[in-house]
């Protein structure tokens, strides 16, 4: 069983991101922190929530969670060039419909996400992600979006609903 939470949508700009990260790596090294690549990968996410006063408002609708995220030295850091390059590669490869080695086509897959999560690219792209998994052979794939929630659905005010739904899904699949 696989539960995928807050997955990014297919990104047509991923290949450009890979190339730009490769150039940046040659210029500055793999461990360089590039604000340009951060803007390229995450910059558009905060735009919808600009009036909320935090560049991390896209993560969660709960202000306390966002403040805690900002205050934590373990969160909110900028990726290295190498990490950005891997992120762009994952974005490119994840929704490619060729090259999959299907070991367990009966694997139950559940996509969950916040309806307001800019990372998923909207309900249409979220549905396309679910369909991609079905097209590559994982036929028992379902998706559920949670209204009013953003990227960190497990930290939202109504997170108990998400926990409850995932628990019910697991119990159903395991016949518990």
Whereabouts are the PLM-identified features?
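Short, proline-enriched alpha-helix->beta-strand connector loops that line the catalytic pocket
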Residues: 103-109, 136-139
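Acidic beta-to-alpha connecting loop that harbors the catalytic carboxylate
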Residues: 115-118, 149-150
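Catalytic active-site module of serine/aspartate enzymes centered on a nucleophile-bearing elbow/loop
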Residues: 134-176
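Alpha/beta-hydrolase-fold enzymes
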Residues: 1-74
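Short beta-strand/loop motif that positions the catalytic acidic residue
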Residues: 111-113
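Soluble, non-transmembrane catalytic domains of enzymes that act on hydrophobic metabolites at membranes
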Residues: 1-9, 71, 99-100, 128, ...
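Conserved alpha/beta-hydrolase "acid-adjacent" motif
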Residues: 118-128
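Active-site nucleophile elbow and catalytic-triad environment of alpha/beta-hydrolase enzymes
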Residues: 80-101
